[in-house]
C-alpha cells in the first residue's frame, strides 16, 4: 500500500497558546504520552489514506529529573488542556492528546494532515518512574540532566540525550542521538531504530548490548 500524506494548500497549522501551565504528576512507574490510533481508509486501489492525522513536529518535549523533592510535573501551553487528559491505569500514567472534530476550527475540518504548533512541553519525572513512552506523531523528545540507575524509553520519532548519566538504559527511537553523558549498559534493538549516533567526545558507553535480526 501507498500512504497518501498530501496536505491541502491552505494553512493546516493548529495554533495552541495560552498562559503556560504546570500540573503535578502522581507517583507512577511508567509514564506514557499518547494519542488515539489513526483510522485508515481505502482511498482507491493500492492507496490508503488517514481520516485525520495530528503531527506534533513543532511541539518538542523536554524530559528532565523531578524537583528537589523528586516530585514530577508536566508543563505546557494552557490552551492545550482542552485537548489532553491524564488517567492512571495500574502503575502507568497516561497523558492522551485528542482532537475531536467539534473542537477543530472550521478551516481545519476538511484537512487530513494537521500540524499542531505550540510552545515546548516539559516533563519532570517522578522519582519512581522507570519507563517513558512518547507515542505521539513526530514529537521530538530531549532527555536532559537525568541521573538514575535504570531507565527505559521508547519514542515514535526522535530522541536526544544531553547530560544524562544512567547505569542501565534501554532506548528505542526512530532516530537516536547520544550527545553528552554516560551509560554503563546500553540496550538497543536495532530492528526498531532507523539511525543512531554517539558523540564519542562527550558521551561514554561502557557496554553496548545490541539485538535484532542481524545479531
Describe these PLM feature segments:
Residues 1-2:
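Hydrophobic membrane-insertion alpha-helices, especially the h-region
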Residues 9-56:
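Short extracytoplasmic
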Residues 24, 31-33, 71-73, 86, ...:
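Generic low-polarity alpha-helical segments
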Residues 38-43, 96, 161, 171, ...:
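Generic marker of "main functional regions" within proteins
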Residues 58-168, 176-180, 196:
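Right-handed parallel beta-helix
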Residues 164-215:
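Short, surface-exposed interaction patches in beta-rich subdomains
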Amino acid at each position: 500500500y501507498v500512504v497518501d500524506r498530501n496536505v491541502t494548500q491552505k494553512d493546516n497549522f493548529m495554533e495552541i497558546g495560552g498562559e503556560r501551565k504546570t500540573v503535578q504528576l502522581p507517583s507512577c512507574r511508567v509514564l506514557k504520552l499518547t494519542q488515539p490510533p489513526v483510522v485508515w481508509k481505502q482511498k482507491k486501489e493500492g492507496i490508503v489514506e488517514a481520516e485525520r492525522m495530528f503531527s506534533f513536529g513543532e511541539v518538542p518535549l523536554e524530559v528532565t529529573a523531578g524537583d528537589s523533592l523528586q516530585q514530577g510535573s508536566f508543563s505546557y501551553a494552557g490552551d492545550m488542556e482542552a485537548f489532553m487528559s491524564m488517567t492512571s491505569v495500574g502503575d502507568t500514567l497516561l497523558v492522551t492528546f485528542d482532537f475531536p472534530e467539534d473542537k477543530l476550527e472550521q478551516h481545519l475540518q476538511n484537512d487530513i494532515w494537521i500540524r499542531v504548533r505550540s510552545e515546548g512541553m516539559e516533563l519532570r519525572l517522578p522519582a519512581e518512574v522507570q519507563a517513558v513512552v512518547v507515542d505521539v506523531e513526530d514529537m521530538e523528545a530531549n532527555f536532559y540532566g537525568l541521573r538514575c540507575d535504570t531507565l527505559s524509553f521508547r519514542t515514535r520519532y526522535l530522541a536526544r540525550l544531553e547530560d544524562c548519566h544512567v547505569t542501565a538504559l534501554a532506548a528505542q527511537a526512530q532516530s537516536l542521538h547520544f550527545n553528552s553523558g554516560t551509560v554503563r549498559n546500553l540496550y538497543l534493538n536495532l530492528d526498531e531504530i532507523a539511525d543512531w549516533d554517539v558523540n564519542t567526545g562527550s558521551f561514554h558507553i561502557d557496554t553496548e548490548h545490541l539485538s535484532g535480526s542481524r545479531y
